[in-house]
Amino acid sequence: MLIIPAIDIKDGKCVRLTRGDFSQQKIYLDNPLDMAIIWRKQNAKMLHIVDLDAALTGEMVNFERIRQIVEELDIPVQVGGGIRSADDVKRYLDMGVGRVVIGSAAVTNPELVRELMKTWRASKIVVGIDAVNGVPKIKGWTESANLKDFELAQRMKDMGIERIIYTDITRDGMLQGVGYETTRRFAELAGMKVTASGGVTNSEDLRRLAGLQYCGVDSVIIGKAFYECNFPCQELWYNFEEGICLDHNFSTARKR
């Protein structure tokens, strides 16, 4: 199972929210690039980046910060947050982003997905479904869609989408355990590749999710649990290494 660290960017800083609530925002680092380098040094094979400002406003205000991360690292980066047009997608993919995550637009403008699938390979476009009790939430989780989560997934599958990033909002940022049953139900009904997200707290959560590979769950995005050092290996790195060097020319970075 592929483990993907998450980086959320708000006002240019690396933050984490609790259940998507912007009033419950915690800043972890002022420079998201430094955070990306830390995760890469801890053996990340992919990063998941969300532009929270873009999700709120539709303006890609953190585009250059994301570009820095993409150019600096030697691993794929997937990006979501406020991507609402084919031009937005093209800007990110032309810049070198590995894949783009379509969120609310999959509900509000499904023709965008159809258009994208005519232009890009399925590996470049994924859809994020964030749900509460099986109902997708859109527009920063402020509105509910008029269909079930698995129904939305099946519509996307019919358009050529092969992967869904599925977030159980009730668990997101709570550090109270992954939404195992909701993820299992969704994956079984969707019949697609699924990246699980929301609530992963410890190694036991990862073991449980690994048991869902039979229904397509092959990867997981981890946010707050990493930032709060919930995994023993992180304590080793932080306590016994002589500091994590944030030299942007570390050995795995691309040479400029």
Curated annotation (Swiss-Prot):
The record's catalysed reaction(s) read: 1-(5-phospho-beta-D-ribosyl)-5-[(5-phospho-beta-D-ribosylamino)methylideneamino]imidazole-4-carboxamide = 5-[(5-phospho-1-deoxy-D-ribulos-1-ylimino)methylamino]-1-(5-phospho-beta-D-ribosyl)imidazole-4-carboxamide
Originating organism: Chlorobium luteolum (strain DSM 273 / BCRC 81028 / 2530)
Where found, per UniProt?
Answer: Cytoplasm
| GO MF entries | 1-(5-phosphoribosyl)-5-[(5-phosphoribosylamino)methylideneamino]imidazole-4-carboxamide isomerase activity
Query: Which residues are the signal sequence here?
Result: none
Q: Which NCBIfam families match?
A: 1-(5-phosphoribosyl)-5-[(5-phosphoribosylamino)methylideneamino]imidazole-4-carboxamide isomerase
* Protein name per Swiss-Prot or TrEMBL: 1-(5-phosphoribosyl)-5-[(5-phosphoribosylamino)methylideneamino] imidazole-4-carboxamide isomerase
* Record Pfam families: His_biosynth (PF00977)
